[in-house]
């Protein structure tokens, strides 16, 4: 089993401000529910750290929390942020970590999350936040989703496959932005457009993914972060909402998985009405 770390960060802002996004914690709940599911990587509770809920948080506190992620002992790390973000005057993306004041916005450059200068880092960063020139409200909420049909899959086997895909990749960093630079990330009636689109993709495609795994000789199916980006772009740009962005830092021929499914291979494959073969481990 490889050494993994997942940090889930939320910052709704100041409760007294008009742009307070009270549902960021619920959004984080739903991100965690997906990642703990078999196809989301079957992450264990002890591998997950939640940061920022109910307390004022600061960039230095997050940097201390990230120390284990920036060591060679960490084989793979994932960072998810839901809250307020912006593009600074010098064109750098940043997230807002603590409850801000007029005197101090306490912005943390996104660059500080990427492990730059550390060639051993394998990391995915997902930022569901604005990238406009000033921080702007974007409610972050996943609509409650039905994952029951995919939870029946064996999490242990999926986790092993997920780990193998991670270690096949060269050390690199993948970044998913919910919107393009200088643009806002919009909310919906029930949450954020980006998070809703992601969750809908999982819900609508899970049966198709399972069918692909059933028909694979080894019982495997994977769907990369790049695949997710393409589907998110198709949905959000097609509806003229916002344009997600995806970047890779470093060189690799293999991308990190968003979904990894491994079904038992002790099963019978059918071709229409005819039994084709029986597969064994």
Model segments located where?
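Cysteine endopeptidase catalytic domains of the caspase/legumain-like
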Residues: 1-281
């Amino acid at each position: 089993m490889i050494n993994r770390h997942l940090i889930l960060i939320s910052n709704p802002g100041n409760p007294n401000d008009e742009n307070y996004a009270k549902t960021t914690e619920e959004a984080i709940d739903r991100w965690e529910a997906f990642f703990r599911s078999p196809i989301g990587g079957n992450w264990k509770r002890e591998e997950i750290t939640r940061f920022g809920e109910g307390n004022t948080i600061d960039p230095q506190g997050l940097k201390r929390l990230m120390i284990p992620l920036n060591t060679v002992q960490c084989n793979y790390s994932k960072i998810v942020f839901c809250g307020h973000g912006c593009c600074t005057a010098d064109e750098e993306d940043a997230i807002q970590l603590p409850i801000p004041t007029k005197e101090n916005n306490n912005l943390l450059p996104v660059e500080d999350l990427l492990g730059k200068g550390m060639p051993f880092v394998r990391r995915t960063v997902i930022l569901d936040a604005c990238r406009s020139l000033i921080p702007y409200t974007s409610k972050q909420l996943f609509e409650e989703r039905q994952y029951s049909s995919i939870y029946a899959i064996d999490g242990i086997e999926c986790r092993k496959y997920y780990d193998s895909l991670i270690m096949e990749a060269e050390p690199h960093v993948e970044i998913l932005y919910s919107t393009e630079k200088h643009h806002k990330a919009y909310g919906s009636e029930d949450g954020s457009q980006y998070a809703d689109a992601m969750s809908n993709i999982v819900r609508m495609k899970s049966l198709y993914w399972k069918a692909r795994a059933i028909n694979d000789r080894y019982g495997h199916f994977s769907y990369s972060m790049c695949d997710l980006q393409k589907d998110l772009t198709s949905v959000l740009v097609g509806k003229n909402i916002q344009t997600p962005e995806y970047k890779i830092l470093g060189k690799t021929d293999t991308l990190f998985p968003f979904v990894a499914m491994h079904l038992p291979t002790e099963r019978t494959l059918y071709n229409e009405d005819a039994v084709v073969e029986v597969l064994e481990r």
